[in-house]
Amino acid sequence: MRNDGAALLQHRDDIAGISDPGLWVFPGGHLEWGEAAQDGAVREMEEETCYRCHDLRLLTRLPLEEGELLFFWENYDGRQRLVCREGQGLEFVDREKVESMPRQPYLTAVFDLALAAQRCPPFLRGTETNAPKHDG
């Protein structure tokens, strides 16, 4: 997420046989065998955009028949150059524009969650992957 609330979206290739052909999605992908979800998200983001995440946080989970989608977020640092290495393009998009883009129905709800998380004070942003542990 950029500081102005725009989210980075990837325009998927319009090729039969891939997931979400021709749709706008959050960058992502599949986990490698034995890979932790957060590590996979960092790897996929770097593979698809050349962006190296440093403060990735779990946002939400979406259960599916064949598993689940996990969504992570972090604020874009504004320094690293983004490069589209998969798909037709990358674009920072504001919430209103998303409504008119070809997308999965859940994208707008996840976008809203990311906006809410971004507005939270930092001490409320802990997740299961980086929240302080309590001894009992």
Question: Where do the protein language model's features map onto the residues?
Answer:
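Short, charged/polar surface micro-motifs in flexible loops or helix N-caps
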Residues: 2-7, 15-16, 32, 66, ...
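The catalytic Nudix box helix
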Residues: 26-59
